[in-house]
Every structure is written in structure tokens, then in C-alpha cells.
């Protein structure tokens, strides 16, 4: 009895010791893990949530010593919340940003410079992918995915108008002539889809057109709203509206299903257009490429095309105490072949910033007429936007003037003067 009891006690003691040791090992492993926070709106939107969650899970599997804590914030709120968190000394480690928000955050001084840590990655990025992401010579954001605007054209509509469907307009003069032919031959078709709403995105979208006319109403090297170039742009926009070449007041997204239904001839829009068209009309890739094409913006007097970047960026914060892990995650999101296939192309319908890849499957996915045109021809034409603390106010003033130009008969000189008056406040 004594021997049995002693043996039982020894067994219990051994089991207890094993449990304690196991718990200690597990606790030690947990303590060895680094947890980083990732503020983003990708998890806030149903269209992208599954993709980003899958990519985060794959990153954690490949990096078992790092946990990613996703912080969901809506697109409309993320910039404001990040500024507040920088000021309170409690920012996330990494955040998803876009457009003017990137420069607003940089202006706080709260972003970690990336020039050194990202040097090897930057060496394999496409020319033009860093446009607008450097402040005082320092890289403040890593391009995550790219969605610049291109000049889409409907070959079937062009052919009906007697135009060469394989030769889209290369200059503003050629564009004007093509718009006239399309309107005369197909009066129910919208010749050109452009965003003329009064919002910040609309200024971003119209900025390349302004540059085509040599206009720089605001920003670095601004020549003002009363310049001859800005008046020429406003006059051109009025002419398009008066002749019925554009449909005023529509957001750019409203034209996407219409071009899929052969109701829009030319569309100034991003790379995601192909996905929208094929989802709408169920076209095969082969039929799509026979029916649609994309190229660079028609040039003005300077003979140069322009575009704008509508993609997303990743930033790291100075107050992060886990910069090594944060960078590893950022680099994974932007450059890992699996992440690119799953999220960038699969869910976000955009392009990766990387110039080359050794992944054969990814090479095949990227080797399409549309992706090649964007990567090789359009991305190099991306022009910096007039981003800064006053961008939103400037957008309101400028686009209000554009709207007045396309909807009223008020003299262009007066409209330009009104824009300038608001910009000077």
C-alpha cells in the first residue's frame, strides 16, 4: 500500500512538473513573439477583407515570431485618427494610407523615414512608383499597390465612328476630332468619361488634364488660376460640355458599367476598369482585348502625357518600438509574390510596385496587354499631385470653378478670378 501510494504521489508530482514546465515554455514562446499593430481600411470593406486577412495569416505563418493585430478604421476616418494618435504618442506600427493623407501624416513629423531600411526593396520598384512619396529627399511611404489612371478606349465605338480602333488619340487635337466623330455617328454614346464632381478625388483625376494644358493653379511652382494655361483648360472643359462630349456631374465610377455596355467611348480611369467590365458583361479575356484597350493620356502642346496615382501606400511610425518587424510586414505586403497574387491583383485589382519577379505564376498573371501598358507606359507618366494641408480646400475651390465652367455661361476670366480669390484666402 505504501509503495503504491508513493508511486502515485511521484506520478502526480511528475505530471504536475511537466505541466508547469510546459506552461513555462509556452509562456516563454509567447513572450518571444513580437506583436505589431496595422491600422487599415482593407478589413473594413467587404470586398477586400477576406483577401487581407488571408495575407496576414500567411505572413504570420511565414514569420511565427510575429503577430499582426489588425485595427479596422474606415477610409474616411483613418487620416484624422492617425493624426490624433501621433499627437497622443500612441500610433500603430504600420498603417495603410492613400493620396493627400500620406503627406498630411508626413507633415506631422510622426512618420519613420524609410530610405535606408527600404533601400534594397526600392531598387526593384518600377520607375515612377515613388512619385510624391518623398519629402525633403526622404522616403516617407512604401507603395503597396498601384492604380494610376489610363486612357481607356472602346474599339467597337471607335470603329462605328470611322476611326482606327487600334490607333487611339495621341494628342488633344486628335481627341477633339475623335469626340466629334463619335458624337455625330452615335449620339446616344458618351464620348468621354471624366469625373467633374466637387471632391478631392476629382481634382486628383483632373490634375493631369490641367498639366496637359500647362496649368498649375496650386502647389509647388503654381502659376495660379488666372494663368492663360488654366483658362485654356477651363475653356476646353466648357467646350466639351457644350458639345455634349462629356456628361457633367458624374463620379468616375458611374462610367464603368456604361463603358461595359458600349455607352462610353473613352474613359479616364484606373486599372480596375477591366475587372468591372468583365464582371458586368461576362467577357472572356480574349474578347475583352479585342473590344477594349488602354493607353497614355493624349498630349498637349508640351508633347508629354501625365497620370495620377490612385493606389495605396504603407507607412511606419517613428514611435514604433518594433520597426524591424514592422518593416518585414510592410515589405511582405508590397513585394511577396503570394501577397501580390492574393490581395493586390486578386482582391484589390491593382498592380504591384515591383519591377521584376522570379515567381512564374505571378509573371504570367502580370503579362497581359492591360498590365503591361500600365507598367511600361502609364506608370512612368505619374505626376506629383499638389498635396499638402491646403489640398482639400484647394480642391473645393478649383472643382467648383470647373463645375461652373461646364454648367454656366459665366465668362471664363471671371471664373478663373473667383478660383484664384478662394485659393488666396
Residue ranges, per PLM feature:
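Glycine-centered hinge/linker elements that transmit conformational signals in sensory
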Residues: 176-181, 220-249
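Structural recognition of the beta-strand scaffold that forms the well-ordered cores
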Residues: 37-40, 69-71, 93-96, 141-143, ...
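Conserved N-terminal structural module of periplasmic/extracytoplasmic solute-binding proteins
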Residues: 2-5, 9-17, 26-104, 165, ...
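Extracytoplasmic "Venus flytrap"/periplasmic binding protein-like
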Residues: 54-125, 134, 160-162, 167-170, ...
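Conserved C-terminal helix/tail region of periplasmic/extracytoplasmic solute-binding proteins
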Residues: 159, 165, 360-361, 377-425
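C-terminal lobe and pocket-closing loops
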Residues: 272-289, 300-400
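Hinge/lid segment of periplasmic solute-binding proteins
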Residues: 98-150, 176, 190, 202-205, ...
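Periplasmic solute-binding protein
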Residues: 105-109, 129-167, 195-219, 308-317, ...
Amino acid at each position: 500500500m505504501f509503495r503504491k501510494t508513493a508511486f502515485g504521489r511521484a506520478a502526480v508530482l511528475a505530471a504536475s512538473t511537466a505541466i508547469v514546465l510546459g506552461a513555462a515554455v509556452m509562456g516563454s514562446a509567447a513572450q518571444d513573439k513580437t506583436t505589431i499593430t496595422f491600422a487599415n481600411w482593407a478589413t473594413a470593406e467587404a470586398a477586400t477583407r477576406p483577401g487581407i486577412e488571408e495575407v496576414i495569416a500567411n505572413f504570420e505563418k511565414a514569420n511565427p515570431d510575429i503577430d499582426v493585430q489588425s485595427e479596422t478604421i474606415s477610409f474616411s476616418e483613418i487620416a484624422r485618427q492617425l493624426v490624433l494618435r501621433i499627437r497622443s504618442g500612441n500610433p500603430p506600427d504600420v498603417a495603410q494610407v492613400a493620396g493627400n493623407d500620406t503627406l498630411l501624416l508626413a507633415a506631422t513629423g510622426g512618420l519613420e523615414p524609410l530610405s535606408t531600411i527600404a533601400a534594397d526593396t526600392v531598387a526593384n520598384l518600377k520607375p515612377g512608383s515613388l512619385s510624391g512619396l518623398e519629402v525633403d529627399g526622404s522616403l516617407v511611404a512604401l507603395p503597396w499597390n498601384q492604380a494610376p489612371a489610363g486612357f481607356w478606349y472602346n474599339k467597337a465605338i471607335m470603329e462605328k465612328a470611322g476611326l482606327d480602333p487600334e490607333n487611339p488619340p495621341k494628342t488633344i487635337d486628335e481627341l477633339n476630332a475623335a469626340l466629334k466623330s463619335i458624337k455625330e455617328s452615335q449620339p446616344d454614346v458618351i464620348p468621354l468619361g471624366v469625373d467633374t464632381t466637387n471632391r478631392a478625388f476629382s481634382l486628383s483625376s483632373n490634375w493631369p488634364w490641367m498639366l496637359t494644358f500647362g496649368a498649375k493653379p496650386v502647389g509647388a511652382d503654381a502659376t495660379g488660376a488666372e494663368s492663360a494655361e488654366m483658362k485654356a483648360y477651363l475653356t476646353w472643359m466648357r467646350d466639351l460640355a457644350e458639345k455634349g462630349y462629356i456628361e457633367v456631374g458624374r463620379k468616375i465610377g458611374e462610367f464603368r458599367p456604361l463603358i461595359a455596355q458600349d455607352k462610353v467611348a473613352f474613359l479616364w480611369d484606373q486599372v480596375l476598369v477591366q475587372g468591372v467590365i468583365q464582371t458586368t458583361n461576362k467577357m472572356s479575356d480574349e474578347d475583352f482585348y479585342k473590344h477594349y484597350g488602354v493607353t497614355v493620356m493624349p498630349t498637349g502642346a508640351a508633347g508629354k502625357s501625365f497620370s495620377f496615382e490612385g493606389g495605396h501606400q504603407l507607412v511606419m511610425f517613428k514611435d514604433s518600438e518594433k520597426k524591424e518587424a514592422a518593416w518585414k510586414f510592410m515589405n511582405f505586403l508590397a513585394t511577396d509574390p503570394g501577397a501580390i497574387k492574393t490581395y493586390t491583383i486578386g482582391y484589390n485589382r491593382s498592380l504591384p510596385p515591383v519591377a521584376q519577379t522570379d515567381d512564374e505564376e505571378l509573371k504570367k498573371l502580370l503579362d497581359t496587354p492591360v498590365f503591361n501598358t500600365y507598367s511600361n507606359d502609364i506608370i512612368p507618366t505619374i505626376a506629383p499631385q499638389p498635396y499638402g494641408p491646403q489640398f482639400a480646400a484647394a480642391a473645393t475651390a478649383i472643382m467648383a470653378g470647373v463645375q461652373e465652367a461646364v454648367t454656366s455661361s459665366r465668362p471664363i476670366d471671371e471664373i478663373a478670378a473667383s478660383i484664384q480669390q478662394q485659393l488666396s484666402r
